[in-house]
């Protein structure tokens, strides 16, 4: 049986940290003129994925 491959798209998007998986916010790439300054500011930086998505991300990254 060959080794399971990691989903390369997921490997580019998620980073394992001590407290969970880090990811960049969505809706921050283009057509930002319609979006308010407050909304753009809130989407800055990165955050941790929610507890309901941890199992899905780990499966894509072949953690378990």
UniProtKB/Swiss-Prot annotation:
One of its GO terms (molecular function) is structural constituent of ribosome. GO terms for biological process: translation. Signal peptide: none annotated. Keywords: Ribonucleoprotein, Ribosomal protein. It comes from the Bacteria. InterPro entries: Ribosomal_bL35 (IPR001706), Ribosomal_bL35-like (IPR021137), Ribosomal_bL35_CS (IPR018265), Ribosomal_bL35_sf (IPR037229). Belongs to the bacterial ribosomal protein bL35 family. PANTHER family: 54S RIBOSOMAL PROTEIN BL35M, LARGE RIBOSOMAL SUBUNIT PROTEIN BL35M. This is Large ribosomal subunit protein bL35. It comes from Ectopseudomonas mendocina (strain ymp) (Pseudomonas mendocina). The lineage of its organism: Bacteria, Pseudomonadati, Pseudomonadota, Gammaproteobacteria, Pseudomonadales. The gene is rpmI.
